[in-house]
Amino acid sequence: MLLSRHRERLAANLQETAKDAGERWELSAPTFTRHCPKTARMAHPFIGVVHRINSYSSVLETYCTRHHPATPTSANPDVGTPRPSEDNVPAKPRLLESLSTYLQMRCVREDAHVSTADQLVEYQAARKTHDSLHACSVYRELQAFLVNLSSFLNGCYVPGVHWLEPFQQQLVMHTFFFLVSIKAPQKTHQLFGLFKQYFGLFETPNSVLQTFKQKASVFLIPRRHGKTWIVVAIISMLLASVENINIGYVAHQKHVANSVFAEIIKTLCRWFPPKNLNIKKENGTIIYTRPGGRSSSLMCATCFNKNSIRGQTFNLLYVDEANFIKKDALPAILGFMLQKDAKLIFISSVNSSDRSTSFLLNLRNAQEKMLNVVSYVCADHREDFHLQDALVSCPCYRLHIPTYITIDESIKTTTNLFMEGAFDTELMGEGAASSNATLYRVVGDAALTQFDMCRVDTTAQQVQKCLGKQLFVYIDPAYTNNTEASGTGVGAVVTSTQTPTRSLILGMEHFFLRDLTGAAAYEIASCACTMIKAIAVLHPTIERVNAAVEGNSSQDSGVAIATVLNEICPLPIHFLHYTDKSSALQWPIYMLGGEKSSAFETFIYALNSGTLSASQTVVSNTIKISFDPVTYLVEQVRAIKCVPLRDGGQSYSAKQKHMSDDLLVAVVMAHFMATDDRHMYKPISPQ
């Protein structure tokens, strides 16, 4: 920040410069440059012929916008009160006296008789092109729409309301500039350069136009923010100002569609001649015809009557509360994506009751910037918002909050008492649905990409010389045949002899029982044995297997699995043993306890530090049939969540609705057994 004395000095310099520089440079005759070749000059309709380098400077555009604004100086709207044209005029540029003198030396007037004939022809052609653009009927039609909408929203639509929220301005621009692209496709870029001044977008490059020209736009906005309110105003002014345009409106409930239909009729009848309207209530259609012009139409429908919009032709289709639209109605709506001159605008709040139905959130990964989200928490502080119960708005206070929205801790607490998480969803919009997957993410995307892409060729002789002689296998058995529930996870890890902290994943299995029979222990042991055999064939340097069979679910079944595996394993195998406190007997099972958190932390650190890799020839007889085993594991790693406990500890979980974390737990524990030297492995003693 500037110190106060520097700020005062700069303000004094600015005041002195503005007082001394009075050159306005308003020319009645065109100006031509001296000694400028044709390839290095350009004709400008407001100035004359100048050097082409001016096209890369904002000074020329600022000067023209100031003295030749595209916005009308005396607007005559059909409704409402026009806004002052000075509101959208940039600051007047000031020229130093030395710069002004130099420019006058380089430029001459047309009446100085030094301009060449070809420069005059170039200027006249540029001027004619500019005048023809302003004389275009499409330009006047679109200009009338902006003037009418601006005046209508200037305290006429709702008394006392003169300004729009940022998302409402975005909605107007997405609607308007798409109309420009279909009404005047050859002159879209020229009209964009003119009409962007109406929105105060003086420094916006023409490349942004591609965003407005896209076939679909999505707006996720919290409730009670004026979504339907601005849609009614836009549709009303479109019908009254633009000819030959077809608009569609689809709502999630019949009473909403009827309310919008009635409000648009009320608005048009109040501010425009009622004789221009042709209302057909039986099919929810409004036809507006201006004297001497072609008619424009609006059809209001609901998702329950999806066949009513089939066969229609819409240039603009507004889908209100799209997250609550019936899924079987979506094909009829999305069919308009195939129409060349049609745009779909989805407007919705986030579905609090079932976040999985917020299908619009999938568009955040689209190649086009289709998703527009109104949120009161920025991405940088989303974690702070979730971790602090008393926090109700973004700590940086950079985001705009309307005056008619009340956000405080008491409202947050009361809302969440009705339904947990409802306030967060409504407040954060897209953030609440996506933050659950990213809030507690503990493994970075770069680390996962490296783990997935950089796999080690463990069959190479140079690599096998560095592999350890012992293979660590962890079995997390599940005794169920329900493929939607848990399955048996098996992980196999080997360490490096050169770097003990570095380890490699050689095999993984996610096994589900076919039937619940007495052979469950044998099937699980056979699955692990098949994996060990394949690993032994690919890596002949491995001499012994250190195994751990989890016995938390069933100690008897765990002992049975270890016993069978001990008999059929092709390599010498040792097991972790659990000592029975009552009988002092040792069983070949492992009772998983509080060390699970330590194992996850070790695994997470290994992934983030790059000390854990996967083999190019990962053995998997249960996953590889339909999925890449490493990618399958990565999907479970992405779901790892670290949840703080009340006692100050931490708990890790990766359970998902569509996928269990059995394989991940097995790999995590196998890695933990391989890198931790506190565990003792012993063979099963014959009785």
From Swiss-Prot:
Region named Disordered: 67-91
Subunit (UniProt): Interacts with the terminase subunits TRM1 and TRM2. Interacts with portal protein.
Domain of life: Viruses
Biological process terms in GO annotation: chromosome organization
Descriptive protein name: Tripartite terminase subunit 3
Keyword Nuclease annotated: no
Keywords noted in UniProt: DNA-binding, Host nucleus, Hydrolase, Viral genome packaging, Viral release from host cell
Taxonomic classification: Viruses, Duplodnaviria, Heunggongvirae, Peploviricota, Herviviricetes
Catalytic class of the enzyme: hydrolase
Role this protein plays: Component of the molecular motor that translocates viral genomic DNA in empty capsid during DNA packaging. Forms a tripartite terminase complex together with TRM1 and TRM2 in the host cytoplasm. Once the complex reaches the host nucleus, it interacts with the capsid portal vertex. This portal forms a ring in which genomic DNA is translocated into the capsid. TRM3 carries an RNase H-like nuclease activity that plays an important role for the cleavage of concatemeric viral DNA into unit length genomes.
GO MF, one annotated term: hydrolase activity
EC number in record: 3.1.-.-
Motif (Walker A motif): 221-228
Membrane spanning residue stretches: none
One GO location term (cellular component): host cell nucleus
Family under the similarity heading: Belongs to the herpesviridae TRM3 protein family.
Primary location recorded for the protein, binned into one broad class: host cell
Span of the annotated motif Walker B motif: 316-321
Gene3D superfamilies hit by this protein: 3.30.420.320, P-loop containing nucleotide triphosphate hydrolases
Organism: Human herpesvirus 8 type P (isolate GK18)
Active-site residues from the entry: 321, 476, 550, 662
